[in-house]
Amino acid sequence: MRGVFVTGTDTDVGKTMVSAWLAQHWRADYWKPIQTGSTEGTDFESVARLAPAARIHPSAVVLPAPLSPHEAARREKTRIDLSSLVPPVTDRPLVVEGAGGIMVPINEVALMIDLMERLSLPAVVVARSGLGTINHTLMTLEMLRRRRVPLLGVVMNGQKNPANRQAIEHFGGVRVLAEIQPLPAVTAATIAGLPPPTFTCPGDP
């Protein structure tokens, strides 16, 4: 399967924007296996709006509360089964977006990193560019490597910070794939106006 798993060092670091950017420029399919906080709108709706070239697949699990998947499911008196999270079949690149960071619980025994390990797609880690990002990013990279999740690289989101980029590349032994500076507004036009990725979608067609 040709694709990437877009994860982040935290929630609200820009995973959906980066997913839309990749999906638009690669003309890819987009799938978010678990969507929480659906009462506030869904990320697949956002990507459909931001990346008109993308083909959107519905989430396998949609939960109303804006909480971690395990807690959002508990409040609905249900349980998320990892085996039910099966990627869509497609002949296009697939951009998969996680919920929260890699250690967020999916149920009482499984974490997001377990799903990443199961899917075995190369990870794109979205990180903030500012203070605190070195620690969060290096810990995320360390856990991904411990679990042998393939790692494509890091996308930094925010004002450029050369010192933080250098530290992440040096200590993390990873490539910073892109630096996306703050946009005046996040729209289909501004996403399309971003420079295209300088890296190709990995995997077999």
Curated annotation (Swiss-Prot):
Its EC number is 6.3.3.3. Pfam families: AAA_26 (PF13500). Mg(2+) binds at T16, E97. GO terms for biological process: biotin biosynthetic process. It is an enzyme of class 6 (ligase). GO terms for cellular component: cytoplasm. ATP binds at E97, G98, A99, G100. GO terms for molecular function: ATP binding; dethiobiotin synthase activity; magnesium ion binding. Its cofactor is Mg(2+). Substrate binds at T36. Catalyzes a mechanistically unusual reaction, the ATP-dependent insertion of CO2 between the N7 and N8 nitrogen atoms of 7,8-diaminopelargonic acid (DAPA, also called 7,8-diammoniononanoate) to form a ureido ring. HAMAP family: BioD (MF_00336). Homodimer. This is ATP-dependent dethiobiotin synthetase BioD.
